[in-house]
A protein has these predicted regions:
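Phosphate-binding and adjacent anionic-ligand microenvironments
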Residues: 38-208
């Protein structure tokens, strides 16, 4: 079963194929496995990309570059690094100088036509890390990020969530929010880290 959908202005897509979610990073993963030679100049994405996808890219010998979050930042780094392809996990696929959800959808359909059995196997074999984004409205996001990333609790949580995990704090570029990314091989680790971060926020009275 195949479902494809676009966002309001048509520059992002998301889909479902045989119950597998298809988004920007999954489509990139499929492309590098079927058209490895097309990405010799490298691929650009953002810190929101699952580390398993990053590993898959570099394993293929493809240079990987990371920009700040936002399609304009991805574009800028693509130009700087002479890359013809970039993506965001949210569904943006960026081709040289534009992003087009319809084209992204057609590319996925062309991959199915080329080798549907291989697509099925690639999707079945892919084991992404568990990933969660938390959003908080805080009194002072910059101060919070500085304080927690220089705290003993942060060092402890980093040690706990590794290997293969990470904690990323960033200030939203579109809303007055602190966004926290938790990624780990273990759901249990993500739950524990989230609980400890929320306790820190409560203890330090960071919430507005």
């Amino acid at each position: 079963r195949l479902i494809l959908a676009l966002d309001g202005d048509g520059d992002r897509f998301i889909g479902s194929y045989n119950s597998y979610k298809i988004d920007g990073e999954i489509l990139c993963y499929l492309l590098i496995n079927l058209y490895n030679d097309k990405f010799k100049n490298g691929i650009v994405s953002t810190p929101l990309t699952n580390r398993k996808i990053v590993q898959a890219i570099t394993k293929e010998g493809i240079p990987y570059y990371e920009s700040k979050v936002g399609d304009s930042n991805v574009f800028d780094l693509m130009i700087k690094k002479h890359c013809k392809f970039g993506f965001e996990a949210s569904g943006h696929l960026l081709f040289s100088s534009y992003s087009d959800g319809i084209l992204s959808s057609l590319i996925f359909l062309s991959l199915l036509e080329k080798d549907e059995n291989k697509i099925k196997k690639l999707l079945k074999d892919l084991k992404l890390n568990h990933f969660k984004q938390l959003n908080y409205s805080l009194k002072n996001t910059d101060e919070f990020i500085f304080n927690i990333t220089h705290s003993d609790i942060y060092k402890s949580l980093i040690s706990y969530i590794k290997p293969g995990g990470r904690i990323l704090f960033r200030k939203s570029g579109t809303e007055d929010l602190c966004r926290i990314i938790l990624e780990s091989r273990s759901k249990k680790a993500i739950k524990k880290v989230q609980k400890e971060i929320e306790k820190y926020i409560e203890d330090k009275r960071c919430v507005e």
